[in-house]
A protein has these predicted regions:
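N-terminal juxtamembrane cytosolic/stromal segments of multi-pass membrane proteins
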Residues: 1-52
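C-terminal ends of transmembrane helices
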Residues: 28, 86-92, 133, 137-138
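Membrane-helix interfacial "entry" motifs
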Residues: 30-38, 42, 61-65, 69, ...
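Alpha-helical structural context
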Residues: 33, 90-91, 116, 139
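Hydrophobic alpha-helical transmembrane segments in multi-pass membrane proteins
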Residues: 42-84, 103-130, 150-165
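Juxtamembrane interface at the ends
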Residues: 79-98
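Interfacial loop-to-transmembrane junctions
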Residues: 135-156
Length: 165
């Protein structure tokens, strides 16, 4: 079983192994994560995290809130990777591509499994930004400052898009 790539055919144990590695050893995870290999496995991983988030958010906050929140999260995952990639490449001369950017964002979605908890929700979102920052360093070969600036630029632009929707 690999802890650097989620393989759905290996079942729930594989999900738990990858989730644990992303959350507890993100530098090691992103170091070992292949920047290529397709969209399917990372998006399934993100989908499982999103389902856990949605189901538990329904229980805690009710269906209307859960639907609204999952819609906004989906928008962030639709626009966010593209904005990250464009900011990285055009502003900071990053070397990565869209596939690697989407993969790092999908695995940063591991935080969704904790974001439904009222007291921890905001911390989970902040930690997901940290995970994206770490992934940007590796996938786009950016130094720490450029990775941080890219993450902040993408956060601001994505937030503005979500606010306008």
């Amino acid at each position: 079983m690999s802890d650097s790539e989620f393989l759905p055919q290996e079942g729930p144990k594989a999900f738990a192994l990858v989730w644990r590695k992303v959350m507890l050893d993100p530098r090691g995870f992103y170091r070992d994560m292949p920047a290529t290999g397709g969209f399917e496995n990372p998006l399934i991983f993100l989908g499982v995290c999103g389902f856990v988030y949605f189901a538990l958010r329904v229980v805690v906050f009710g269906l209307p809130d859960a639907i609204n929140t999952i819609f906004l999260i989906a928008l962030a995952y639709i626009f966010g990777p593209g904005i990250l990639m464009l900011a990285s490449q055009f502003v900071f001369q990053g070397e990565g591509d869209y596939e690697g950017t989407l993969r790092l964002c999908a695995y940063a979605g591991a935080c969704l499994a904790l974001a439904w908890i009222p007291a921890l929700g905001i911390l989970a979102y902040v930690y997901s930004l940290y995970l994206i920052f770490l992934g940007m360093e590796k996938v786009h070969r950016l130094d720490t400052t450029k990775a941080a600036m890219t993450t902040l630029v993408a956060l601001v632009v994505t937030s503005l898009i979500i606010i306008w929707v």
